[in-house]
Amino acid sequence: MLLAPHTMHQISTPIIQKTGAQAVVASLLRHSITSGFGIPSIHNIALYEALRQTPEFQHWIVRHEQAAGFAADGFYRSSGKVAVVFASTGPGNLFTLVPLLESLQTNTPVLLIGTNIASSLLASTGGALHETPEQLEIIRPLTRFARRVTSPDEINDVFAQAAEMLLGSLPGPHSLRSLMTSFLLH
């Protein structure tokens, strides 16, 4: 079920890029991607704060990540504009598998931006919140492009690669997986 469009800003001040989350939002706008669907969570809260500060980005909060995936697919089919799916770590990312498959089979461009646990916890098996081994490898077969971003410095280049394929030569779903620490680092 889709909730009403949610304008995530209170003041219209431009984002001064300081964090990985702000770099993600700036990259979306640079490639004219201005709409998205998703659920705020502990692992992507910095991203939602950056979205809140960006009045030109329209976001719809949904009740389930699968709904976000289908909404982004339908958004493109009805408007011709790419939308983003914002998914949280672990189960949230995996709930997007069915809509990603639909987008893949119909060559519908959709961009999935998912999160992962903190980089310091990746190699552990200590039971971090929403820890799911090899999330990117699970999603990779259902996307045309899948990449893990491990540093805020990589965000602009990775977005440029994804956007070139997403908006041009290789339509279909694309996935960017960002470590939680990438959103928080300067």
Task: Give the ranges of each region predicted by the language model.
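N-terminal alpha/beta PP-like core and its mobile active-site loop of ThDP/TPP-dependent enzymes
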Residues: 2-186
